[in-house]
Structures are given as C-alpha cells and as structure tokens.
A protein has these predicted regions:
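Bacterial N-terminal signal peptides
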Residues: 7-15
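Extended active-site neighborhood of metal-dependent phosphoesterases/phosphodiesterases
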Residues: 72-79, 86-91, 162-256, 279-281, ...
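Active-site neighborhood of phospho(di)ester-bond hydrolases with catalytic His/Asp-centered motifs
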Residues: 115-117, 150-156, 160, 179-185, ...
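Short, ordered, surface-exposed loop/turn motifs in non-cytosolic proteins
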Residues: 22-26, 30-45, 62-63, 324
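Short acidic, glycine-rich surface-loop motifs adjacent to enzyme active sites
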Residues: 254-276
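Residue-level detector of conserved catalytic or cofactor/ligand-binding positions
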Residues: 310-324
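Short, acidic Ser/Thr/Gly-rich low-complexity loop/linker segments typical of extracellular
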Residues: 42-60
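N-terminal active-site segment of His-dependent metallophosphoesterases
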Residues: 24, 31-32, 71-165
C-alpha cells in the first residue's frame, strides 16, 4: 500500500512540475472568417495542428517567447509595415491566440523566389543603394508577367544599429513582394552576457529567429546559426540543439524526398576542407556543427542558402548548398 501511495504521489508531483513549466495556448487559424484545417502552429518547441474548424490547442513551454503559424501552401500571412505577421507573443496560460491567413490568388505551384543577403545598413545614407536594389527587384518581378514571387534576406539586415530596421522595411516594400528575414551576426544585440541576450532586437521587429512555411510544393525553413559567445561582439557559426530538435519535428510532417530550402546566415560550409577538419580560427566563418544539420536533411532534396561572406559560391552534392 505504501509503495502504491508513493507511486501516486510521484506521479502527481511530476504532473504538477510539468504543468508549471508549460502554458496552454488555444485559438483558431482563420481565412475570410472561416477556420482553416490542417495548419501547424508552434511555439518553437512543440507543434499542434488545426482541426476542421481551424481550432488548435498547444501545450507551450512557459519560457518560450512566441507562438506562430507555419503558413501553408496556398496562403499568405498579413504584412504590416514590411513585417510578415505570422506570430504573436506567447500569451498567458489559457488565453486565446488567433491567426489570420490570406488566400493566395491563383496557383502558387509555379512562382519566383529571390534571396538577398548582407545589406548591412550602418547609416541612413546607405538606403539610397538599397532603394536602387529594391527597384531592380521590382523590375525583375514585373518582367515575369504576373508570376507570384516571394523573397528572403539571409541576415545582416543592418550593422548593429537596430533603429534602422523600420526604414529598411519601408524600402523593401518597394519590391512589391513579401520579404521574410533571417538573422545575421550584425543583427545581434552585442556586449551581452550570453547567447540568449543576442536576439532580442531582431525578435522585437521580426518575431521568431527560426520558423517555417510552405510555398507551392516546397518547404522553407529559416534558422539562426549566429551563436554569440557572451564576449564583446564575438560569435561562432553554431546551430543550437533546441533548433535541431524543432527542425526534426517540423520535417516529420514533410514527405521524404520533398524539396526543402533552408535559409540562414552563416554558411554551413564554404569548401571541402572545412567539412573535413575544424579550425578554431574559422569558427565564425561556417557552421561548426553542420554535420548534425546535414543528417536531419538527408531524407530530403535539401538546398541551403546563406550569406555572411559577401561572395557567391555554389556547392552541389553532397550538401546542395548555395551561398550568397
């Protein structure tokens, strides 16, 4: 009897401890006022899928910062002042958190994709060059006669002056297409005490530093491999375990053999040598633990697009890696 009672008490203690570290988030994913079925919602750790009425219920980690929708093919998220609004701050326990999607006009199985990297805007006078580039992108989009496009900036949006994010967003709206963003090392909040202090400015403007979405038959993933080491402005290329675990769960719903495009800032590799042998003096140039990422991506037709080096390199098998 004592053993039975002890088992019950331990079970209750474990349940309470687990509940104390989590919050229940519930809500709906809507399009035109109607629920959308089969949409995945995440807190950066766990996932939940909407039912026929668009309802979801997610047991989220209490220390997570956002809840966000993985925008499915055929849909867009609203864009406000150049920012894609697919996320909300993590609400209090039991509070409702709804998302609105917009139905894409026509078929999105054939579309254009534009990737840029390293604008590194450090002063207002730099925006003239960015505006010229945005106008060039807009002209390119128009030349395709109405084909839908979307774009991603692979990090280093600004050069540590986060007050310039708003103006960057305004200029990029001139492209006429939705631009999402990955975080770069120049987007970090530096001189903090740990990695966890480095992404607050980016998140205040753009939301989660890692997320996913679908366009047509392609699954896109954006990751943050800029690992601030808590000293001055120094960093290494490193993908934390938290993101790898989330990525494994995210890809579990993607059919093996499908095309997956991963966008991040620091390249996973630049040459054959860095895939064979680690060098301390190159720890900030490439992702030091890229093998773990490659293993996760192995079942898919994976392409990795990055920035950071201000050069153009294309590496095919075995990594299918494009670096901007």
């Amino acid at each position: 009897m004592k053993r039975y009672l002890l088992t019950i008490l331990l079970s209750l203690w474990c349940a309470c401890a687990w509940a104390a570290g989590s919050v229940t988030v519930k809500g709906r994913v809507l399009c035109g006022g109607r629920g959308v079925e089969g949409v995945w919602v995440s807190d950066g750790e766990e996932f939940a899928c909407t039912d026929k009425r668009g309802n979801y219920r997610l047991q989220a980690g209490a220390d997570n910062r956002f809840v966000f929708v993985c925008v499915p093919a055929g849909y867009d998220a609203p864009v406000e002042k150049g920012v894609v609004r697919y996320f909300h701050p993590l609400p209090a326990d039991g509070k409702s958190c709804d998302f609105t999607l917009l139905r894409r006009a026509g078929d999105d199985s054939r579309y254009g994709f534009i990737a840029i990297a390293d604008p590194q805007i450090w002063a207002p006078k730099e925006f003239a060059k960015l505006a010229a580039a945005a106008d060039d992108i807009a002209a390119t989009v128009r030349s395709y006669g109405g084909m839908p496009f979307h774009g991603i900036c692979c990090g280093d949006i600004v050069s540590h002056d986060h007050s310039l994010y708003g103006r960057y967003n305004e200029v990029m709206e001139r492209t006429g297409i939705t631009f999402r963003n990955a975080m770069g090392n120049h987007d970090m909040k530096v001189y903090g005490r740990s990695y966890e202090t480095s992404f607050s400015k980016f998140e205040q403007m753009y939301g989660p530093v890692y997320y996913s979405f679908d366009v047509g038959r392609i699954h896109y993933v954006v990751l943050d491999d800029n690992f601030f080491i808590g000293r001055d402005y120094f960093y290494i290329g490193y993908l934390e375990e938290r993101q790898m675990r989330w990525l494994e769960k995210d890809l579990a719903r993607v059919q093996p053999g499908s095309t997956v495009v991963v966008c991040l800032h620091i390249p996973s590799t630049c040459e054959e040598q860095d895939r064979k042998q680690f060098r301390y003096d190159r720890a900030g140039s490439t992702m030091t633990n890229h093998r773990g990422l490659y293993e996760i991506l192995k079942p898919y037709r994976a392409h990795i697009i990055s920035g950071h080096t201000l050069s153009l390199i294309h590496i095919s098998e075995p990594t299918r890696h494009a670096q901007i």
